[in-house]
A protein has these predicted regions:
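Glycine-rich, acidic/polar active-site loops that bind/position phosphate-bearing ligands
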Residues: 2-22
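Amphipathic alpha-helical segments within well-ordered protein domains
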Residues: 59-63, 94, 204-208
Length: 263
């Protein structure tokens, strides 16, 4: 839950690192205590021990920082947050290898060869013309030391990250889904208890702070189905921040994904 790791408008790296260390240990435990319907699945999991830790609440984190999804700042934050997650996930898996042993097929793997996910960019670049591979390769953490540690101590898990849609669990936690922009600021949700209206709490808070939350605004939001783009009273800054999925230029979503995938 990325938004829980934003403090004072910035990413709390120390808290995020602590969360990741706990999460990776938990996921590794699941491999051993899980129920497997077929022996092939059990054998594969115990042999390679892959886990997939992802994120949710990315859009909420941007709301907390006052950043529009369609901006360079959002792309940079996507890069920074995923680097921190990747770094400490790999580090924790390597620590677990010391404690519990490396996964059985570690020898000869890319990890064993000192090839981390960030290093795979170089392999791709060699196979493509330079003009077709323009990817930001900025690094903020000490990857050389981590690379050496992985080669020396091994890895407990063959894979450590996977970004899931989190469609259900994000609703349970009350945050935005996965790494996606908000689908709508206002919508009707249905379950066995009936139908109820859900409105973006960050939008309500921002409007209240500016003295814009009143009956007229409520009716305007209903009329435009949660979109703020055609409501004249709302400042352009808020229109950018609270743009919904189909109002954000696709290139920003692709740029953010491009930055994340290198980790």
């Amino acid at each position: 839950n990325l938004v829980q790791h934003v403090q004072g408008g910035v990413l709390d790296r120390e808290k995020l690192a602590r969360t990741i260390k706990t999460a990776v240990r938990m996921l590794d435990n699941v491999i051993d205590i899980n129920y497997y319907a077929v022996p092939q699945a059990k054998n594969s999991n115990l042999k390679h021990r892959p886990v997939g830790m992802g994120i949710m609440g990315f859009q909420d984190a941007l709301y907390e920082m006052g950043i529009a999804y369609g901006s360079d700042e959002a792309v940079d934050f996507a890069d920074e947050s995923m680097e921190v997650i990747s770094y400490y996930a790999i580090q924790t898996s390597s620590d677990l290898a010391l404690e519990r042993g490396a996964y059985s097929t570690f020898k000869g793997s890319l990890w064993d060869q000192g090839i981390l996910p960030i290093d795979s960019l170089e392999l791709v670049a060699k196979s493509r013309p330079e003009r077709m591979f323009e990817v930001d390769r900025t690094q903020r953490l000490d990857w050389d030391s981590l690379r050496a540690k992985v080669q020396k101590d091994g890895m407990r898990n063959s894979n450590v990250m996977a970004i899931a849609p989190t469609a259900t669990i994000s609703n349970i936690c009350g945050v935005s889904q996965s790494i996606e922009p908000t689908f709508q600021n206002l919508y009707v949700k249905s379950n066995l208890s009936g139908e109820f209206t859900v409105i973006n709490p960050y939008l309500v808070r921002a409007l209240k702070e500016r003295g814009l939350w009143d009956t007229v605004m409520v009716n305007d939001l209903k009329h435009f189905e949660g979109s703020v783009q055609k409501i004249a009273r709302i400042p352009e800054e808020l229109k950018a921040i609270f743009a919904t999925a189909f109002e954000v230029e696709p290139r920003w979503i692709v740029d953010a994904a491009s930055r994340r995938q290198k980790w």
